[in-house]
A protein has these predicted regions:
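Short C-terminal domain-edge/linker segments immediately following a structured domain
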Residues: 38-41, 82-84, 92-98, 180-184, ...
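Acyl-donor binding region in acyl/amide transferases
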Residues: 47-48, 70-168, 288-348
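Generic recognition of stable, solvent-exposed alpha-helical segments in well-folded globular domains
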Residues: 123, 127, 191, 199-202, ...
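A conserved beta-strand-loop-helix scaffold within acyl/acetyltransferase catalytic domains
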Residues: 3-82, 147-302
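Active-site/acyl-donor-binding loops of N-acyltransferases
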Residues: 2-4, 67-68, 110, 154-155, ...
Length: 381
């Protein structure tokens, strides 16, 4: 029997079908609760929509989209000031300021959609294509024409069925996703230290010695609210000094996240002389630990090797709690590699509404996405 697939676009997590979370069981980043966090504490230049795909009356697919309007952004990243950066920022403002992401631009990995395992995937993807076109039409009618549509992030195998449907899209690959696989026989941080080669064990010891005097503290909701402004300033310092940025978080993002997600969201503060000088965040996603945003005082970070110590702390916690892997995501590839994370190449699809630009999308894309040169390390024996 040839049943028809349909779709429904939702503007609020409160309107999602009651059975939504059944499909999101294996990915916290598609649950109603997380989508509520996104909706209520998203970056100032981001609007989220959620798509349900149905077979007759049954929900068989769930999708997250994010619409970014970059003209509200003060900076695309302040670290690199040169002619190419100026050209890139001009191109962004004029030809790429309205971007529709199918997926989550705040995370790395396949957090775009989930389909029921018993349905015909190609048919669901075709319905997704129709839903995207409808959403673009709706946005245009509200005065927000989409310049770029991007479907992200997928492994080489995951992207194949999408390439078959979205034939006019350009397949791109940006920075890899840095993944730390935790061997099953590791139970403590010492197991990790013992596996390091002498050079990297010395690096570990040096970093830990440098962190003398720093107190690490798990922060609860009241603590996060108390230090909200300091936390945000530490985050913002790191974010605005990144070479490229398409959004900045809302000031209440971390407290709202903690309020809704509870123990699935962890925020650790780093104190020196009773002053908060850094923080990092972790999200429990089944047996996978996702690292999230962090921030630090630059003057202390260099002297105390704070960032490296945060990475070691994340590894130690994840081993102790029995997680299978840690998603260290993009950026700072070399230092993440030096603690044992391995690069996994990720792909996405992109198309531009302007036919001329779309014809030259590969060259245009290189302007928008700065290439990162880095050297992979292997810290293990």
């Amino acid at each position: 029997m040839n049943t028809t697939y349909s779709f429904q676009i939702y503007k609020s997590a409160s309107l999602l079908p009651v059975e939504w979370n059944l499909l999101a069981a294996d990915n916290i980043f598609l649950t109603r609760e997380y989508l509520e966090v996104l909706e209520n504490s998203s970056p100032v230049n981001m609007t989220c929509h959620f798509i349900g795909i149905f077979e007759e009356e049954k929900l068989i697919g769930i999708v997250l989209t994010q619409f970014l309007f970059a003209e509200k952004l003060e900076s695309f990243g302040e670290r690199d000031k040169c002619l190419k950066t100026s050209v890139r920022n001009f191109a962004l403002k004029n030809f790429a300021s309205h971007v529709l992401f199918i997926g989550n631009n705040m995370l790395t990995g396949q957090n775009a959609f989930v389909f029921d395992k018993n349905i015909k995937q190609s048919k669901a993807i075709k319905t997704l294509h129709k839903a995207i076109n409808q959403l673009k039409k709706d946005l245009k009618e509200s005065g927000k024409k989409v310049h770029i549509t991007s479907i992200k992030d997928f492994t080489a195998k995951e992207i194949e069925p999408l390439q078959a449907e979205f034939k006019n899209n350009y397949t791109f690959s940006t920075q890899p996703n840095m993944i730390f696989e935790i061997p099953k026989n590791w139970e403590t941080e010492q197991d990790y230290i013992d596996a390091l080669s002498k050079k990297y064990r010395d690096q570990y010891k040096r970093a830990r010695k440098k962190s003398d005097g720093i107190l690490k503290q798990k922060m609860f909701l009241d603590d996060i609210k108390k230090y909200e402004d300091v936390i945000y300033d530490l985050y913002f310092h790191v974010a605005k000094n990144a070479p490229f940025n398409t959004f900045f978080l809302a000031r209440n993002h971390f407290s709202f996240f903690k309020e809704i997600m509870g123990e699935n969201f962890l925020l650790y503060g780093y104190f020196l002389d009773e002053k908060l000088i850094g923080f990092n965040t972790l999200i429990k996603n089944g047996d996978v630990m996702d690292t999230y945003f962090l921030g630090y005082d630059e003057s202390v970070q260099r002297e105390k090797m704070l960032y490296l110590n945060m990475l070691y702390d994340m590894i130690a916690y994840s081993i102790k709690k029995g997680f299978r892997e840690i998603v260290f995501a993009r950026t700072a590839l070399e230092i993440k590699s030096s603690v044992g994370a391995k690069p996994v190449k990720m792909y996405g699809l992109i198309t531009h509404s302007n036919a001329l630009i779309n014809h030259n999308i590969s060259r245009f894309f290189n302007y928008l996405e700065p290439k990162t040169e880095w050297q992979e390390r292997n810290p293990f024996k």
